From Swiss-Prot:
GO terms for biological process: embryo development ending in birth or egg hatching; positive regulation of transcription by RNA polymerase II; regulation of mitotic cell cycle, embryonic; RNA polymerase II preinitiation complex assembly. Pfam families: TFIID-31kDa. Its main location: nucleus. The gene is taf-9. It comes from Caenorhabditis elegans. Keywords: Nucleus, Transcription, Transcription regulation. This is Transcription initiation factor TFIID subunit 9.
Amino acid sequence: MADTGEKDTETTASGTDGHSKEALAVISMLHECGIQEFDPRVVSMLMDVQYAVTSKILQMSSGLSRHAEKAQIEAEDVQTAADMLGVLTTNAPDREKILQLANDKNQQPLPQIRHNYGLKLPNDRFCQLQQNFVYKADDSYQPMEMQQVTHQPHIIEPPTQVLRPEHVQNMLKRRAPDDDFDS
């Protein structure tokens, strides 16, 4: 625990806002990729991935050096381990190969839809897929002149009748079953 406290004081003293060297390297990689805004948790996630990949490569290279009966891990062992894991290679598939796979997949017909499956659309003549209007250009079209509209202020006058309790009681009473609801 004392080591982390010393590390924090060293990094803050150097003006790195409490980030370690590894975190600063990840942040600089993000900035080089054009990512200016990111969640601070992204840095720790990328550091976790970096640690996992590095430890996997080193474990593999350690196994390779032990198999070759070497006392130390050499750069060749690390390079071989990285090649075996495929970490450092970024070989994207060829465009032609992807197009060929897509064409092969698209040549296969889709399975037939069962007759009783889902909702069916009505016949085309009953579907409103076509426009239902015809635009007629009017040659005598003239734009209207803008007129200024003046609004008279509408004054709400106080009601002349006051709501009485008997009016409220009449409104709350149930209607007879033979009453017409439209009236």
